[in-house]
């Protein structure tokens, strides 16, 4: 089954905030690598969406996006809805999606 990725406004904002932070505080290269890793991870999720860990919300799953961020998402019909990208430096249990 082919799944379509749908970005919520929150997930899109989170992604762009991280990209901006990396460009401003690290380098354009760091931002590009983050984008590439994110795309690879999203491809894996689209291929096998039920492998990651479920959260306390029965329909919400989470997966480690990289060393510093976790991605929350849900699967509805043929859609994978990306809910948010949350930094590990914050308490993940305080995320509204956990």
Where are the regions a protein language model picked out?
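Basic/aromatic recognition patch in beta-strand/loop cores that engages polyanionic ligands
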Residues: 40, 48-80
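Alpha-helix N-cap/helix-start and coil->helix boundary motif
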Residues: 12-13, 39, 70, 89
């Amino acid at each position: 089954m082919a799944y379509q990725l749908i970005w919520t406004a929150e997930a899109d904002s989170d992604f762009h905030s991280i990209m901006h932070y990396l460009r401003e505080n690290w380098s354009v290269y760091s931002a590009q690598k983050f984008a590439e890793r994110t795309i690879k991870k999203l491809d894996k999720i689209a291929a096998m969406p039920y492998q990651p860990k479920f959260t306390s919300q029965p329909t919400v799953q989470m997966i480690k996006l990289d060393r510093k961020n976790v991605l929350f998402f849900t699967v509805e019909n043929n859609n994978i809805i990306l809910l948010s990208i949350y930094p590990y430096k914050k308490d993940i249990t305080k995320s509204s999606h956990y």
